[in-house]
Amino acid sequence: MEGPDARSRHNYAGRDAGVVIAATLPAVIICAVLFFGSCSAANAGSDSSTIYVARRGWHIDIGMAAADLSPPLAQAAAALPGARFVFFGFADKHYLLAKNHDGPVLLSALFPGASILLTTGITNAPAEAFGAAHVITLIATQDQMRELQAFIWRSLRTQDDVLEVYRDGPYEGSVYFLGKPKYSALHTCNTWGAEALRAAGFHVHTVGVIFAGQLWVQARRLKRLEDRAAGTGASLLSGTSD
């Protein structure tokens, strides 16, 4: 339940790099593949929580402390007993679950298709699970956390507000949930991550965000602004972007 170790992250990244070189397709396809590949928010204040932005190669996950999950999204944590932190990532269902990643399957990921969310539960700190250099923390108000969780919940396919595990994930402490939004070359794992942060009220743009680097740059900017504003009472909330 400690999440993907360094060897797993390296193996997944290496496998994806090989796919890109062999297929010469846009790096958007790697978003699906790279699924394989701290302190509690209370420290930030009783009325705030922490959002974790984790970069996993070409893919970015959005996470939070399991204790911060409220109904109905708390059902996701129930599927990962013992997890202290829960991370969500968006992907192309057909590609991610395909037995053979041949040309037709690779190409299909470019066009709108069914999505899936890989949900990972970890028992150690995110910085330990993914590497400190690959995790950005953002302080969120209660309203921001509520809006973020509402966005993630809307992304999940449920039956009568009940969330059911679709199947076990690729490593211990992970499960797949079916998603509602379509995955495509123009709406990738990283587009979804940007939409999640924007839903939480952060000033990020979402249109044209295809690659992890495009979202990572924005998350780093948010972190710098947060650090600068720490003693001034300034806010990172934004009404509009794009």
Regions found by a protein language model. Name each.
Residues 35-46:
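Bacterial Sec-dependent signal peptides at the C-terminal "C-region" and cleavage site
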Residues 7, 37-39, 234-240:
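Intrinsically disordered, low-complexity segments enriched in Ser/Pro/Gly/Ala and basic residues
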Residues 6-10, 17-18, 22-25:
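Short, low-complexity intrinsically disordered segments enriched in A/P/G/S/L with frequent Arg
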